[in-house]
Design a protein with these regions (language model features):
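Bilobed "Venus flytrap"/periplasmic-binding protein-like clamshell domains
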Residues: 39-45, 59-74, 108, 129-178, ...
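Ligand-binding clefts/hinges and TM-proximal coupling segments of bilobed small-molecule sensing domains
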Residues: 27-28, 33, 156-175, 209-216, ...
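Sec/Tat signal peptide C-region and signal peptidase I cleavage site
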Residues: 21-26
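Periplasmic-binding protein-like
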Residues: 44, 124-132, 199-241, 245, ...
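Extended ligand-binding regions for polar small-molecule ligands
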Residues: 65, 69-73, 142, 147-148, ...
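A ligand-binding cleft/hinge motif common to bilobed small-molecule-binding domains
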Residues: 90, 106-116, 160-165, 185-218
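Extracytoplasmic small-molecule ligand-binding "clamshell" domains
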Residues: 33-103
Length: 257
């Protein structure tokens, strides 16, 4: 009887270990289908892309629509989705710790980032620009000697504009902010001289006192981002973007991009 009980305990332990192994090694697609919800990191402060509606509490925009389309592809229902607000500093860590399944948040594809995350092929391309107060009289980056440029934390903008300024022989400094509204507020208060980010994002912040300069810097390709450890899920997302690119382009046009 003792032997029989011991064998039963061993069998139970083996079964538990097998189930745990299966769960731990289940692909992300299967995990999403099992829980019935796609969790997506999106911005909530970027007009046209993903902006929080203060009246309804909903985040709306181009990238939200792309996220819904992906949810429909995986789960058959675009409403089976949970949106989590992120910024350039938080989107990576929230993906790393498993809070998010994917990130669709103006996440620029770079060689360095591709070593850490899986990126789909680009679903949208933009270029970095410069938003300034009209009263400053700036016409291009070449006029900005000694200017303080406001950029988002953990974004590619600081590197790109820093390199462009050096090439133009212009000395500039940078102030980093957690979100875009903070940069615009700093520009309006003249705590920074320039607000720099991708041009289509700047379009949501331009007003009668400001203007976007003609300068464009380094094309920015946006990809849907997933964790590096699931190549099958990454391939699924990449195929989704490729097969739906025309419809995604239509969504961008719908949102004025």
């Amino acid at each position: 009887m003792v032997l029989r009980n011991s064998l039963l305990k061993l069998a139970a332990l083996a079964l538990g270990a097998a189930l745990a192994f299966t769960s731990a090694n289940a692909g992300k697609l299967e995990d999403i289908k099992a829980k019935g919800t796609l969790v997506v990191g999106v911005k909530n402060d970027v007009p046209h892309y993903a902006l929080l509606d203060q009246k309804t509490g909903e985040i709306k925009g181009f990238e939200v629509d792309v996220a819904k389309k992906l949810a429909k592809e995986i789960l058959g229902d675009e409403n089976k989705i949970k949106l989590v607000a992120v910024n350039a500093k938080t989107r990576g860590p929230l993906l790393d710790n498993g809070t998010l399944d994917v990130v669709i948040a103006t996440f620029t594809i770079t060689p360095e980032r591709k070593k850490i995350y899986n990126f789909s092929q680009p679903y949208y391309q933009d270029a970095i620009g410069l938003l300034v107060l009209k009263e400053k009289g700036y016409k291009s980056l070449a006029d900005m000697k000694g200017a303080k440029i406001g950029v988002a934390q953990a974004a590619t903008t600081k590197r790109v504009i820093g390199e462009a300024a050096k090439k133009a022989g212009v000395s500039v400094s940078f102030s980093e902010f957690p979100d875009y509204p903070s940069i615009k507020a700093a520009l309006d208060a003249k705590r920074v001289d320039v607000f720099s980010v991708d041009k289509s994002i700047l379009l949501g912040y331009v007003d009668e006192k400001s203007e976007i300069l003609p300068d464009s810097f380094e094309p920015q390709d946006y990809g849907i981002v997933s964790k590096k450890d699931d190549a099958e899920f990454a391939a699924f997302i990449d195929k989704f973007v490729g097969q739906n690119k025309a419809q995604i382009d239509n969504l961008a046009e719908k949102w004025g991009l």
